[in-house]
Amino acid sequence: MILSILKNIKKQLLFFLVYAVFLMFLVVILFKYSKTDATLWANQYWSPFQDVMYKYMTYLGDFWTASLVVLVLLFWKFKYAIIAMVSFGVTALITQFLKKIIYYDVKRPLIEMWEQMHDGTLHTVVDEADQLINYSFPSGHTTSAFSIFCILALLSKKKWVGFVCIVFAVLIGYSRVYLCQHFYEDIFVGSLIGTIGSLLVYSYIENKTFGNWGEKSLLNLK
């Protein structure tokens, strides 16, 4: 298992190197600022273009995107669809357990930064009526995004695909902070769950035998 994990990290080394840089950036932010100050620091760099980009990009980390990825993989190989489904399911369960059971009382920016939102200090994109209140830690969208793009990178094996995947994952994770839906600590842990969980699932399942049907797809059922 350990050798398989190391092999997969080496296979998509660029993905994991960029991710390591992203983690180090988050660690610096988390040590340097309080969670509200970190949000205010990032918030000052807003722009109309980013408002539109992140508003729609954030949807790539939701349940429907993960479901679509599994559906598409069914047309490639059943085995790949199973790997993705297990990966998305395991990481989502871990995040939802932490979010809804352990850290259920952790408030979102709408509550923690109510004053700044209403005195004009904080630039917001999402309407107040659509802002979430509870279950801030960890970020479910970030978990999903890193799980989705980690699996796609590992399935591809091409380094440039891995680079594109980690860029998308990072941008989706950051969108949660940009849109004032989460704090940096939420996306930090969410990204860890999504990446490590998916790497472990992939490394465990990839060499399992599924019989001939595992190599088949919806395009080749005979």
PLM segments and residue spans:
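Membrane-embedded catalytic cores of phosphoryl/pyrophosphoryl-handling enzymes
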Residues: L3-I5, G120-K222
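Hydrophobic alpha-helical transmembrane segments
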Residues: T58-K77, H141-F146
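Aromatic-anchored segments of alpha-helical transmembrane domains
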Residues: F25-I29, G89-F97, F168-C180
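Membrane-helix interface segments
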Residues: F49-Q50, K77-A81, K157-F163
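Short helix-capping/hinge motifs at transmembrane helix termini and TM-loop junctions
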Residues: F31-S34, W76, I102-D105, K157, ...
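Interfacial segments of alpha-helical transmembrane regions
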Residues: K10-V18, V69-K100
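Membrane-water interface at transmembrane helix exits
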Residues: T39, L74, T95-Y103, A153, ...
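N-terminal transmembrane-helix/juxtamembrane module of multi-pass inner/ER membrane proteins
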Residues: M1-L68, K99-A129
